[in-house]
Amino acid sequence: ASLSLAVLEYLVHVDRDLSPSDLVSIAAAIPNSLLVETVEIGQLPKGWQAPSDQEPLQRLGSEWVRAQTSAVLRVPSALIPVEFNYLLNPAHSDFRRIVWADPVPFSLDPRFLQ
């Protein structure tokens, strides 16, 4: 995961007219000893990248949260499938082991919002 991928994911979902100018980035350090489950592309439903039908993906995420098998789930990015997003489950007991950096303010280059 990277800040640049997070920004891309943000931009495809935000109403650009309502995008705040005072964003922050908070890095997370996940200990090597912490279980990180991974969803491979082959495990995802057909058409998983299509924005029109996200229900199967939402169901997958909800089932992961309910199962409480890990605090972190690594999933392919729909925008750049060779890169990954990390979903965090704050209800999992291992979530407290994740170390958080201080928030770092940043703003988007105005060209992103044109």
Regions found by a protein language model. Name each.
Residues 18-114:
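Active-site and NAD+-binding cores of ADP-ribose-processing enzymes
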Residues 1-22:
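Long, hydrophobic N-terminal alpha-helical segment
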